[in-house]
Each structure stands twice: as structure tokens, then as C-alpha cells.
């Protein structure tokens, strides 16, 4: 078999006659090879090509140093690998069928390779995006950075394009991965793998790739389907955690990414040139360009770019450096940006193990959903001793109940650490974190951001993850005057149900509502009544016609209807009733909301129901715009307190009116609450009977043993 100095490998699929311009630029570049007496061959691989493309390339079939292949791989990675295996050149360059190269690319890159004293990969210095209705963007590529800095940049940014030249042996040693099922960007993976192996990426000075932006390219398809790269050893948390503080890539810290970068992101997000880079992750990088850096670069297009830009015009008349185009062309250096990597580095400090389960929640605070998570974790640990967990919080709130997490749990405060990143970068970062955790079991509880991530990455989840969710109820929307409802099952679960393995809930009512509303398969749901492990205390005894001390304990937020407490209190005699309100105020309720109401005594925040002096109270009043089976009802029952509750969601499954407690059927019926409170004052004895029945139900249905039995069926 004849050997060559260089193999020029062209990948094509459906470029049609556009490929003619590509081939003309290649043939112009080969003239420089011939001048230097560098032997070469041209291999053309048509992958799933259309007829126009196939017919066009037939004209080269009889050229002595051209070979044409046809296959149906449907992926750039296998196409490049095929060409590497067929190559007879000592060195090999990959080119795409719709781009153009400056006529010096082949000879300069070849010279850089043979002059290297170590194994290297060469890329063009400039990449100029062009195309119909596409803004020109000039990307300046730079050489490999010190390893730790390169890691931080590569974490969120593919530094080098897919157009390269290297020893054929290098490309055979590091074949492109065939990525499917939600994974993509084989060139990004190649760059990371070779960098991890210690191979330097260098630049062929003053060479340019003219990248034609088209909407039908496979690379654009990768961008539009939210595909990501798989786990990479180079980004392993343990390695990144060891980085020195001074290894961080240089970032202009005085520029607020939230104010500058996101402002620019919003300005350019709808422009076609976002996909300008030959590599898909460049879409991400343009979105975090900030004006601060660009002000110093606009108008300073390197002379070699202007020269080659004009020189290519006879081959492609769309390309010419008109003064007005030069003025508006933005310059971009992929090595400049590292915000994703910097944030990843901070996250890495919280990662101490490979988890068996990942929980994605908005926060870890004092709440029923948080207790559900804690119960699940405790049960899993009992079923599978030694299990490890990672909890990812997606809102920037303070996680006041982080102390309640099991010791074998890593808490990643993603919402706090990633605050300020534009949406695309935030999604890219979360994808990287989840992938690098190497855990296939994901569980979402009430996190809108996690649901949005799952919606974007359904193909990934379907093929590589086991996704379960917990959801408990729909609830009235206060702004609708309590006539409309919100629920996580629609749209969040409804949008992703094909990739959800199981929907856990704490009440049957929600299952019935969701099946009726959304036609979801009832088999998808699993009711797990939450356990109560508190000591069951004697039933509280209250004397008839004495002043009633009412306990109300919850977050003081509109969803818990604090306005109803005030309305109820205003209809009660302060000589006969006292309502003590416990709970931290949310931002949607004024902290002086209860001031001036004689019956109400605001007692401040509390740290779990067990911290409350329940023995001082006669009855629990519970109000809410929507619920499953609230944990506080179980806890109050265990404490021996009678319960008066609003009847919504699954509340009635535990508080059965005049059997295990007292219900107000219309949750906004002020007179209904007042009437029942007055009834309790007159007849507390019958409420003691309700508590006895409720405690019996508690022992039968809400025991830890019953909960573990249910958990074992799925975990």
C-alpha cells in the first residue's frame, strides 16, 4: 500500500453543491503541499449522503490520489474513525464538507507537527463563522494551558474545534466515541481525553477555518437537543478538589457575570451565530461573553485574518472583510471564560463520595416535603446499610435543616453556588455535576428547576438514569381568589412521565386527581403513607367552657392562609380563645401581619414540631391551600392533640370528620372554623375520642414498620 506524508480526510453527508466550495479550498491548499513536495491523499467519506452530494463527489473518483467511501453511520465520530483506519498518511487532518480552509492550513499545520518534539494535535488559529443571515464571529484558539487551568476551562468550554491535524497513530490511539442516548459532542470528548493523556493542543499560526453556519448540520442538531458529554475522568471531583487556589483560570472578578454576562446573553440568545463554532459547546461559550472583555477587542481584527478573509473571496463570495463587517465582528477566545469551571470547583469541595442516590430538592428547610426526603433516606439506609446520598438544592435559600441530613450525605448547594450563571450555563453545569457524580438513581421532590432540567434531558434520562419523583398535592392559587389550582404533576410530571419510573405520594386522593386530570397510568403511582416515630402520648384533656388555647404552627406563607387565622381570630372572644402562632415568615407575608389582633399571639419560629410545648395547648388548628397528608397532623396526633383542619387534598384520609378529627370542608369558610372551635370549647370530650381513633390509625398505617415494607418494594 502506498504511503503518504499526509491524509486529507473529508467528512460529508448532505452538503450538496456547497461541498464544491470546500473542495476548491482544499485543492488550493494542496498546491502549497506540492510546492514543499509533501505527498498527500484525499479521502472522502459520505455518511448517509443525499443524492446531490453523492453525485457531486463522483467527479473526483478518477483522481489518482482521491478515494471516496460511502457508509451509513449517521454520526461524525464513526466517520472520522473510519477515515483514520483507511488513512495511508503518516499525518492526518480532518475537514468537514461544508467549511473552507485558508490555503496555508495544510502546510503550516504539517510544519508544526513535524517540528514538534512531543506528541501534539494542531488546530487553526482562527475560526470565522459565516453564512446567510449569520453574524460573523471570529474565534481565536490558543494552545494548551497548564493542566489545572485547562481543566477549569474545559469543564464548561470546548477549547478547540474538530478541525485538526495530528499523527495518524494519535487518532487511532484516541478514536472518537460513538455517543448516543443523550450524550453527544464527540469532538469535545476527544479534546478532553487527549488533554487528560498529556497530549498538547497547539496552534498553526495565522491559519483560518471558515465555518459555514447552517441549520441542518448535525452539530446544530446536537445543540438543539440538549445533549451533553458523558463522565470524564479528567473532571473527576477528587482530582479537582486538590487544585491549588492559584491554579484558577484568570477571570475579571470585578465584572459581575449576573449583570454583564447575562445582559449580553439575553441580547444575543436568539441570533443564529450562537452555533458558529465547529464544536457544539461553543453555543454555551458565546452566551457568557461579557461586554467588558469585548470592548477591548472590537475593531482589532488581526491582520492575518483580514488577509486570509479577502484571499478566500474568489472561492466563496459570501466571504469578504467589508469595513462594516469588520466593525461588527466580535472576537472570542474560548480560553478566556471559566465561570462554569470556577463554580464546579466550588461544588467539588462538597463532594466526598460517589452516591447511591441523588435527591434534587429546592431547599432543605423545616417542611413536610423535607421530612419525606429524610424518611426515604433513613429507610434506604436501613434496607441497604452503608448507602450514600447526595442532596442537590436548586434554590439559593438558606438550608436551615441541613443539620438533619444523615452523616453519609453530601449537600451540594447548587442554587446558591450557581446563582448568577445564565440559564444555558447553569444547565450545562448541573448536567456536568450529575454526570460526574456517577450515580444513576435520581429522585426529584418539588424542585421546578430539577423538573426543567429533566424535561430538557429526557433522552439522557431514558437511556442512562432511573428517575423517580415525589409529589403530594395540588393547591389553590391565592392570586386566583382560590378558584384555580397549581400542581407539580401538570406540567412538570406530565411533561416527563415517559422517563419517570415511579411517582411516590403520601395520599390516594392525589393519585385519583392526577389520573383523572392527566390520564396517567395509575400503575405509575405509589402511595407511601409517611411514618411517625414520635412517642404516642396520652390524649390531651381540656375542660368544657374554659379558655381554649389553640396552636397554629407552620411556615407563615400565603399557601398556609395566615389571613384565615386573622379572620377567624377576629370572630373569637379573646376571653374564650387564644391562638398562638408559631412559624418563620416567608417573604410574601409582612412580619407585622398578626399585630393588633387580640386573640393572636405570635410566638416566633420553631425547629420542628417536637420543639413546641404541645402540652400547653388544647387543639391544633391547621390551614392550607393544598396538601397531601401533612406531617404536622401525624405529629399533633402523636402528641395527643385534637385537630381542626381545612379539608383539601389528602387531609381527609387521616382527619376523617367527626371520627379522627374535625374538618372544614370549604377551606375559606371562616364561620365554619369558628363554629367548630366553639363546639370544641363546649364539648371537648368528644374530641378526645377523635384523638384516640386517630392514634389508632397512626399505629396501624403510619408506623415505621409499615413504611419500610412499602419502601422495600421499590428500593
Could you tell me what each predicted segment is?
Residues 1-3, 232, 245-356:
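Non-catalytic membrane-proximal stalk/linker segments that position and tether the catalytic domains
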Residues 26-69:
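Acidic donor-binding segment of Leloir-type glycosyltransferases
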Residues 71-87:
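Glycine-rich, basic loop-to-helix element that forms the pyrophosphate-binding segment
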Residues 106-137:
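Conserved donor NDP-sugar-binding/catalytic core segment of glycosyltransferases
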Residues 182-190:
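Acidic donor-binding loop at a coil-to-helix junction in glycosyltransferase catalytic cores
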Residues 314-321, 482, 486, 491, ...:
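A short, active-site helix/loop in glycosyltransferases that binds the activated sugar's phosphate group
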Residues 625:
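Aromatic "clamp/platform" in nucleotide-sugar-dependent glycosyltransferases that forms part
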Residues 642-645:
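Short hydrophobic beta-strand element within catalytic cores of glycosyltransferases
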Amino acid at each position: 500500500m502506498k504511503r503518504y506524508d499526509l491524509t486529507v480526510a473529508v467528512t460529508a453527508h448532505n452538503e450538496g453543491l456547497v461541498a464544491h466550495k470546500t473542495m476548491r479550498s482544499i485543492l488550493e491548499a494542496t498546491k502549497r503541499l506540492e510546492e514543499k513536495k509533501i505527498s498527500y491523499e484525499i479521502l472522502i467519506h459520505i455518511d448517509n449522503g443525499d443524492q446531490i452530494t453523492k453525485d457531486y463527489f463522483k467527479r473526483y473518483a478518477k483522481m489518482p490520489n482521491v478515494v471516496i467511501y460511502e457508509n451509513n453511520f449517521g454520526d461524525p465520530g464513526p466517520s472520522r474513525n473510519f477515515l483514520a483506519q483507511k488513512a495511508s498518511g503518516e499525518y492526518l487532518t480532518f475537514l468537514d464538507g461544508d467549511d473552507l480552509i485558508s490555503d496555508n492550513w495544510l502546510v503550516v499545520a504539517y510544519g508544526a507537527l513535524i517540528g514538534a518534539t512531543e506528541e501534539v494535535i494542531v488546530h487553526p488559529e482562527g475560526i470565522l463563522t459565516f453564512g446567510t443571515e449569520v453574524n460573523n464571529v471570529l474565534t481565536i484558539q490558543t494552545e494548551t494551558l497548564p493542566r489545572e487551568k485547562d481543566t477549569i476551562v474545559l469543564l464548561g468550554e470546548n477549547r478547540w474545534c474538530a478541525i485538526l491535524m495530528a499523527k495518524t497513530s494519535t487518532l487511532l490511539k484516541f478514536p472518537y466515541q460513538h455517543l448516543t442516548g443523550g450524550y453527544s459532542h464527540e469532538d469535545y470528548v476527544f479534546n478532553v481525553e487527549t488533554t487528560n493523556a498529556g497530549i498538547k493542543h497547539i496552534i498553526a499560526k495565522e491559519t483560518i477555518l471558515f465555518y459555514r453556519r447552517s441549520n441542518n448540520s448535525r452539530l446544530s442538531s446536537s445543540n438543539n437537543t440538549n445533549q451533553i458529554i458523558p463522565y470524564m475522568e479528567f473532571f473527576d471531583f477528587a482530582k479537582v478538589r486538590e487544585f491549588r487556589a492559584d491554579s484558577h483560570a484568570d477571570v475579571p472578578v470585578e465584572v459581575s457575570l449576573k449583570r454583564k454576562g447575562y445582559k449580553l446573553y439575553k441580547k444575543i440568545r436568539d441570533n443564529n451565530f450562537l452555533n458558529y463554532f465547529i464544536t457544539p459547546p461553543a453555543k454555551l461559550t458565546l452566551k457568557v461573553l461579557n461586554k467588558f472583555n469585548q470592548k477591548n477587542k472590537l475593531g482589532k481584527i488581526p491582520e492575518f485574518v483580514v488577509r486570509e478573509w479577502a484571499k478566500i473571496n474568489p472561492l466563496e463570495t459570501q466571504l469578504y472583510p467589508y469595513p462594516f463587517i469588520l466593525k461588527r465582528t466580535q472576537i472570542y477566545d474560548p480560553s478566556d471564560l471559566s465561570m462554569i469551571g470556577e463554580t464546579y470547583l466550588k461544588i467539588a469541595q462538597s463532594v466526598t463520595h460517589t452516591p447511591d442516590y441523588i435527591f434534587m430538592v429546592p431547599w432543605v428547610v423545616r417542611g413536610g416535603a423535607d421530612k419525606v426526603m429524610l424518611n426515604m433516606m433513613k429507610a434506604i439506609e436501613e434496607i441497604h446499610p452503608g448507602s450514600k446520598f447526595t442532596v442537590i438544592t436548586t434554590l439559593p435559600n438558606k438550608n436551615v435543616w441541613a443539620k438533619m441530613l444523615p452523616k453519609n450525605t453530601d449537600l451540594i448547594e447548587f442554587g446558591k453556588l450557581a446563582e448568577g450563571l445564565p440559564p444555558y450555563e447553569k444547565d450545562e453545569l448541573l448536567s456536568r455535576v450529575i454526570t460526574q457524580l456517577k450515580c444513576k438513581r435520581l429522585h426529584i421532590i418539588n424542585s421546578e428547576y430539577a423538573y426543567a432540567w429533566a424535561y430538557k434531558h429526557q433522552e439522557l434520562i431514558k437511556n442512562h438514569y432511573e428517575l423517580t419523583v415525589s409529589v403530594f398535592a395540588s393547591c389553590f392559587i391565592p392570586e386566583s381568589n382560590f378558584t384555580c389550582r397549581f400542581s407539580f404533576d401538570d406540567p412538570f410530571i406530565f411533561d416527563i412521565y415517559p422517563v419517570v419510573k415511579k411517582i411516590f405520594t403520601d395520599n390516594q386522593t392525589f393519585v385519583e386527581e392526577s389520573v383523572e386530570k392527566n390520564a396517567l397510568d395509575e400503575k405509575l403511582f405509589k402511595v407511601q403513607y409517611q411514618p411517625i416515630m414520635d412517642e404516642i402520648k396520652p390524649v390531651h384533656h381540656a375542660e368544657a367552657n374554659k379558655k381554649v388555647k389553640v396552636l397554629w404552627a407552620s411556615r407563615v406563607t400565603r399557601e398556609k392562609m395566615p389571613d384565615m387565622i386573622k379572620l377567624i381570630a377576629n370572630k373569637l372572644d379573646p376571653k374564650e380563645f387564644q391562638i398562638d402562632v408559631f412559624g418563620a415568615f416567608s417573604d410574601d407575608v409582612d412580619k407585622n401581619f398578626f399585630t393588633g389582633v387580640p386573640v393572636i399571639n405570635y410566638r416566633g419560629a420553631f425547629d420542628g414540631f417536637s420543639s413546641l410545648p404541645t402540652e400547653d395547648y388544647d387543639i391544633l388548628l391547621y390551614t392550607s391551600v393544598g396538601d397531601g397528608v401533612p406531617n404536622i397532623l401525624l405529629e399533633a396526633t402523636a402528641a395527643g392533640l385534637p385537630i381542626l383542619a381545612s379539608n383539601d387534598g389528602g387531609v381527609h384520609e387521616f382527619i376523617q370528620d367527626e371520627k379522627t378529627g374535625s374538618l372544614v370542608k370549604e377551606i375559606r369558610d371562616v364561620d365554619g372554623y369558628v363554629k367548630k372551635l366553639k363546639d370544641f370549647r363546649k364539648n371537648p370530650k368528644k374530641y378526645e375520642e377523635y384523638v384516640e381513633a386517630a392514634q389508632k390509625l397512626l399505629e396501624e398505617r403510619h408506623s415505621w414498620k409499615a413504611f419500610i415494607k412499602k419502601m422495600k418494594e421499590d428500593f
